[in-house]
């Protein structure tokens, strides 16, 4: 009886090791492919929120890291993509976090010119409720397009709220928390951009590590 138990235990252990090794091999085999798909998706989004006709540089390669937990909703350094034309700054795209979504963090990216005009906003990742909060995805709703061409200023940032809170933006039926959190993140981030964009364009490029991130 004891030998049978030991034998079965060894078989189970061996099976578990084989399964673990198989999962590790699959993860390793697909890691580069997933990273490449993510890079291509980011490139596609950058083309949407910072139009090619306003810049002539490689936007994806013109990246710096910045850090401000209060403005960006996270302690991690976040990428900023700097757009220029004839070596003159024209616009940027910045990733940011809305930490107070209904189901946690919402990661988004904002394209904005140097005068504060929003060129586009897109949702990168989220866990909001399907059919309600997921209207922050462009494929589910045109809501994110309501940011297009709006000019942000510190004096008028009280308008960057949902209508229920006295602002200019629609909320979602049955889901006010998600758009409210989204708008707070956009507003905080644009204030941060306005205060720092001139300095960012004078920074050395590099997003491979946190060495160039703001402290």
Swiss-Prot record:
The chain crosses the membrane at residues 9-29. The modification FMN phosphoryl threonine is found at residue 176. It comes from the Bacteria. Its cofactor is FMN. GO terms for molecular function: electron transfer activity; FMN binding. It is found in: Cell inner membrane. One of its GO terms (biological process) is electron transport chain. Its EC number is 7.-.-.-. It is an enzyme of class 7 (translocase). Keywords: Cell inner membrane, Cell membrane, Electron transport, Flavoprotein, FMN, Membrane, Phosphoprotein, Translocase, Transmembrane, Transmembrane helix, Transport. GO terms for cellular component: plasma membrane. It is a single-pass membrane protein. The keyword Transport applies. The keyword Cell membrane applies. The complex is composed of six subunits: RnfA, RnfB, RnfC, RnfD, RnfE and RnfG. Part of a membrane-bound complex that couples electron transfer with translocation of ions across the membrane. Belongs to the RnfG family. PANTHER family: ION-TRANSLOCATING OXIDOREDUCTASE COMPLEX SUBUNIT G (PTHR36118:SF1). This is Ion-translocating oxidoreductase complex subunit G. It comes from Shewanella amazonensis (strain ATCC BAA-1098 / SB2B).
């Amino acid at each position: 009886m004891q030998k049978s138990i030991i034998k079965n235990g060894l078989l189970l252990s061996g099976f578990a090791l084989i399964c673990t090794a198989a999962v590790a091999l699959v993860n390793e085999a697909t890691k580069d492919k997933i990273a490449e798909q993510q890079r291509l998706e980011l490139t596609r989004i950058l083309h949407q929120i910072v139009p090619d006709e306003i810049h002539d540089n490689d936007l994806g390669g013109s990246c710096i890291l910045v850090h401000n937990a209060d403005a960006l909703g996270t302690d991690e350094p976040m990428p900023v993509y700097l757009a220029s034309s004839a070596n003159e700054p024209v616009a940027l795209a910045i990733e940011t976090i809305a930490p107070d979504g209904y189901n946690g963090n919402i990661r988004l990216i904002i394209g904005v010119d140097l005068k504060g005009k929003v060129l586009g906003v897109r949702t990168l990742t989220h866990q909001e409720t399907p059919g309600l909060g997921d209207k922050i995805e462009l494929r589910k709703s045109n809501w994110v397009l309501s940011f297009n061409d709006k000019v942000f200023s510190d004096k008028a940032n009280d308008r960057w709220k949902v209508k229920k809170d006295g602002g200019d933006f629609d909320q979602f039926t049955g889901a006010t928390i998600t758009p409210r959190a989204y708008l707070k993140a956009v507003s905080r981030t644009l204030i941060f951009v306005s205060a720092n964009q001139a300095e960012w364009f004078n920074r050395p490029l590099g997003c491979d590590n946190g060495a160039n991130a703001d402290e």
